Amino acid sequence: MNAVLTSLPPYVVLAAAAFLVLALPRRAGHAAAALATLFTFVQAVLLGDGGTGAHVATQLFGFDVVLFNVDQFSLLMGVVVGFLATAAVLYAYGTEAPTWVTAFALVYVSSTLGTIYAGDWLTLIFFWELMAVT
């Protein structure tokens, strides 16, 4: 079970959900976004049982990068951010916020999770700057 959870970083799921919010009708897009944020919450909860370590490591421009590193603190932050993001998506749907606002919020949460699960400085700086842009 852990291999499935660690093969896909949660920020990839949220970035895809941001595009789905824009592409799908309002109700379906927000449902996809709620499921994506709920996935990040559940993933962090389930990885708390022995899922720590560097999971998605590769080389980028000659540098070793770890795109998905899990430790106990990042799991705690992943649970908190996943829960709050799910509540925010449901609130955005309930208040009839424009879909582009929800999409930008998902990109911001996605980059936040990227900083939380960053395993090296290059990954951290990339996602931190992405947070600043969104």
Identify the function of each model-found stretch.
Residues M1-A103:
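Transmembrane helix-loop-helix hairpins at membrane boundaries of multipass inner-membrane proteins
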Residues A103-T134:
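Alpha-helical multi-pass transmembrane bundles of energy-transducing inner-membrane proteins
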